[in-house]
Amino acid sequence: MNVCKRLIVALLVTVMMASAYAAKPSAEVVNACLQGESRGRAIWTTIATNEVGSDDDFRGGYKATLFTADGRDVGYAEKDGRDGLIWRRTIVPLRRAVPLDHPPETPSTFTPLLADWSTIKQGSQRFICVNFNFDGLGRSGSFQKIHGLYLMGIPQRGKATPVLFYGVRRIE
């Protein structure tokens, strides 16, 4: 095989692996996150938010609100409107969230202590779920049942950084 063919094959394999990793969460995972309970094969587990840590100088001067999930730090990082979710020591910017909706919604900030935090496992996939109702206000009026959600796909050991998804849904 010549060098050009090897390069093309390597590139195709890389793209296929990246696409598989960044696959959107299933409907069961999204529903488990919104409803706060297991759905189908998506196993939902709450993250205790009654024990909160904070760090006013987290990685590059971010202010962090931290919880523990599976022995690891998870949470919310704030700095000059460049907020993000935390997994271990990695900050995943909200603005990089992949939309779950069409047309896509603009990722929204939220107050971490007012949100519901959980983990969801489906097969070999694991997610951190953050479900929030726009700081207790909903969208307004008849839209009080509208919630925002972030699902952060947790990479398997030794893999790339987490992938973040964002959506807005109505809770029934």
How should each PLM-predicted stretch be described?
Residues M1-R6:
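Positively charged n-region of N-terminal signal peptides that target proteins for export
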Residues A22-E172:
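Exposed acidic/polar residues on beta-strands and adjacent loops within beta-sheet cores, strongest
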Residues V9-M16:
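Bacterial N-terminal signal peptides
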